[in-house]
Amino acid sequence: MLGKALGLMKKPKKTVDQSTDAGGESKAPLGDISKMLNASGRIGLQMLQKMAAVYDKVEFGRFVQQPVLVGASIQAGSLATQNRHAKEELNKTVIFEVDAAEAASSSSESLKHAIYPLVKNEYASGRFHLFPIGRVEGNDMIMPDYAISKQHATIEIRRGDYLIRDGGSTNGTFINGKRLDKKPVQIRDKDIVAFARYEFTFLFPESLYEMLRGS
């Protein structure tokens, strides 16, 4: 009581959410990444860049939680034209034909902004350790392209490892150029993972942080 009267009460301990940057300015709490994903499971590149500029690698990794798939390139080619009614085409995957005359793949600025953390949306259902990928709703990573199958592939988180298996897709799932079957294959940091014509780089939070910081 005497301490209260004299204004000698202990100052509250500073929590992680009340941390400060090098300049002494307070930083906003990092928040929950699952609440920052859009309906397709993506998170904004600019948001991540700002966070990487303010927070250290440990704090950033705590926020991201899991590895991410970062858009890299689109393979040159075209979707095969098929004589089907429009309603049928909406429900079926179209075969992707590689264009041998074009470069193997081309960089896409819009795809580079496609970053999918292996984290379920706050409203998502299903088992926590399974991360389904496909063209339609119900997947954690949604790619609305006819080259992508409805249930294209699944990534499984198993005791700190990340395993991917193809779901019997029309245009295939690839790791570093090798087509997969339904047998699970481990993905490692900086592997190139492709779904049909779309290529992504698989990055652990530490590698994502370094990429965003330009290291």
Q: Where would I find each of the regions flagged by the language model?
A:
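Intrinsically disordered, low-complexity acidic Ser/Thr-rich regulatory segments
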Residues: 1-143, 206-215
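Residue-level signature for short turns and capping positions that connect secondary-structure elements
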Residues: 74, 138, 148, 160, ...
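Exposed loop/turn and edge beta-strand positions of beta-sandwich/beta-sheet ligand-binding modules
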Residues: 127, 158, 181
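Short hydrophobic/aromatic patches on the structural cores and recognition surfaces of FHA
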Residues: 133, 151-156, 160-175, 190-192, ...
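A structural connector/turn signal
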Residues: 138, 143, 150, 180-182, ...
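Surface-exposed loop and edge beta-strand positions of immunoglobulin-like domains
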Residues: 144-146, 165
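C-terminal boundary/linker segments immediately following FHA domains
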Residues: 174-215
